Amino acid sequence: MDIRSDDAKKPMMMWFLGMLLFSMVAESNAQLSENYYASTCPSVELIVKQAVTTKFKQTVTTAPATLRMFFHDCFVEGCDASVFIASENEDAEKDADDNKSLAGDGFDTVIKAKTAVESQCPGVVSCADILALAARDVVVLVGGPEFKVELGRRDGLVSKASRVTGKLPEPGLDVRGLVQIFASNGLSLTDMIALSGAHTIGSSHCNRFANRLHNFSTFMPVDPTMDPVYAQQLIQACSDPNPDAVVDIDLTSRDTFDNSYYQNLVARKGLFTSDQALFNDLSSQATVVRFANNAEEFYSAFSSAMRNLGRVGVKVGNQGEIRRDCSAFN
């Protein structure tokens, strides 16, 4: 979709609003530090890495599950581990419809890492920081870039399913819709495109993109922006009426963190509408092409975007708490 010149200022306006929001929380973000636990739990990164690696060796879904959980957590209430809270009434953040598909392996990864950390540094390291470290570690385990993680987040005291609605990008969004959501969290267009590259690993239920394969429009049953051969592959893969049927988001290298996601977009093989829109829209197309042609440029942008994501809505200082159990408030 090309954005008309009359509308071109709207995404830019959202970026400026997002940057304003980001500057408003800069003071609290400044309290994050790469060596935050240098004196209180100096081995925290090694402890988390060992726990994550052990879990990853048990199942490769650990990587996409943990990375996706970090994204979902940060976009609702900020990066504060609010997505881990369990509620008997099933009204916590994790119970929202948009979070019900979060894989159990993501929860298990952080819980096991938290247990390992608590055995060495009881009551010191937040679940939010452990999730941030685990998200970095799984990226490295599947071949992605290694980057420094800022620490010092506190765990949140609020977790409500009702606050999730509208906070997470849907697979049917266009670039304008994506920009609005990311900018509301202080993230730029480049951040959004780079973070979308996390779709190079993981899978999706067929119902999340079925509208592109069947009854797309009155005259076109299949989305015309999708490569026809790829469309037939998906139709065949999703022929099973089982609602739990899944396909890999990146059919070329599902378990490797690389830039093939962007190469697929250039070839019109993006799984979600929101994926393919990144190439179809002129405001994001050039960046997609750069990332498709240069893996190192993508890795650099992704590393920067992950650090920016990790600063969203953080609780620091006297805000929040250090949970003893990630699934329950103290």
Curated annotation (Swiss-Prot):
Residues 1-30 form the signal peptide. It catalyses: 2 a phenolic donor + H2O2 = 2 a phenolic radical donor + 2 H2O. PANTHER family: PEROXIDASE 55, PTHR31517. Heme b binds at H199. Substrate binds at P169. Removal of H(2)O(2), oxidation of toxic reductants, biosynthesis and degradation of lignin, suberization, auxin catabolism, response to environmental stresses such as wounding, pathogen attack and oxidative stress. These functions might be dependent on each isozyme/isoform in each plant tissue. InterPro entries: Haem_peroxidase, Haem_peroxidase_sf, Peroxidase_pln, Peroxidases_AS, Peroxidases_heam-ligand_BS, Secretory_peroxidase. Belongs to the peroxidase family. Classical plant (class III) peroxidase subfamily. Disulfide bonds join C41-C121, C74-C79, C127-C326, C206-C238. Ca(2+) 1 binds at D73, V76, G78, D80, S82. This is Peroxidase 55. GO terms for biological process: hydrogen peroxide catabolic process; response to oxidative stress. Ca(2+) 2 binds at T200, D250, S253, D258. The record marks R68 as: Transition state stabilizer. One of its GO terms (molecular function) is lactoperoxidase activity. Keywords: Calcium, Disulfide bond, Glycoprotein, Heme, Hydrogen peroxide, Iron, Metal-binding, Oxidoreductase, Peroxidase, Secreted, Signal. Induction: By methyl jasmonate, a plant defense-related signaling molecule. It is found in: Secreted. There are 73 peroxidase genes in A.thaliana.
